Curated annotation (Swiss-Prot):
Protein's name in the database: Large ribosomal subunit protein bL31
Keywords, in A-Z order: Metal-binding, Ribonucleoprotein, Ribosomal protein, RNA-binding, rRNA-binding, Zinc
Encoding gene, per UniProt annotation: rpmE
Organism expressing this protein natively: Mycobacteroides abscessus (strain ATCC 19977 / DSM 44196 / CCUG 20993 / CIP 104536 / JCM 13569 / NCTC 13031 / TMC 1543 / L948)
Binding-site residues, Zn(2+): 16, 18, 38, 41
GO molecular function terms attached to this record: metal ion binding; rRNA binding; structural constituent of ribosome
Length: 74
């Protein structure tokens, strides 16, 4: 590797909006990062996330327009 072209890799403190703090390594020179969500408060990691699947495109179409009778019944 060439010397002098890579940024310094230093220990960095990360502070979340929920108050959780942890230490990692980063190339950010200040050594301090503030984030809005982390693994302690993100819904995906806490299990509070709801997965909504209404059954696909056919079910969505039928819900919007309703089931119609075949053209032969008219």
């Amino acid at each position: 590797m060439k010397s002098g072209i890579h940024p310094n890799y230093v220990e960095t403190n990360v502070v979340c909006g929920c108050g959780n703090t942890f230490t990692t390594r980063s190339t950010k020179e200040s050594g301090h990062i503030v984030v809005e969500v982390c693994s302690q408060c993100h819904p995906f990691y806490t299990g509070k996330q709801k997965i909504l699947d209404s059954g696909g495109r056919v079910a969505r179409f039928e819900a919007r327009y309703g089931k119609r009778k075949a053209a032969a019944d008219k």
